[in-house]
């Protein structure tokens, strides 16, 4: 299980690296999907299934709309690939910063905390991640509806901006 968690963590870092050093939005969406799937799988393996599902829906529902909008506006005939020197430089600098953070965190003794899952707290009849579901739908229903209407409005705004002068996504910016 430890090796599986380390593998998921490595894939999550690589997905974040793909999003941070994306040469064009075409490749950034691949990194976003990888990072969100692996991050939600990481939470799922810790036992937080509801939060994992909500984050998966939010990331793939909300952030992919932003990437579709940016892809439609970035009409690059020759997009840069991940093998270009500028993109490789971004990736190497990102890995150097992560390694420096790991060294500083190791020297400060931040690795002694361990991992606590939602089932390891004691004898509860309801798991900790499901105890907030009732509060989410009862007390948070107003903000839930406001967020839904905001996302719907954002969708219409993005569609109107992309439409432009009835040229669709083909127009050059």
Swiss-Prot record:
It is a multi-pass membrane protein. Signal peptide: none annotated. The keyword Transport applies. One of its GO terms (cellular component) is mitochondrial membrane. It catalyses: a ubiquinone + NADH + 5 H(+)(in) = a ubiquinol + NAD(+) + 4 H(+)(out). Pfam families: Oxidored_q3. This is NADH-ubiquinone oxidoreductase chain 6.
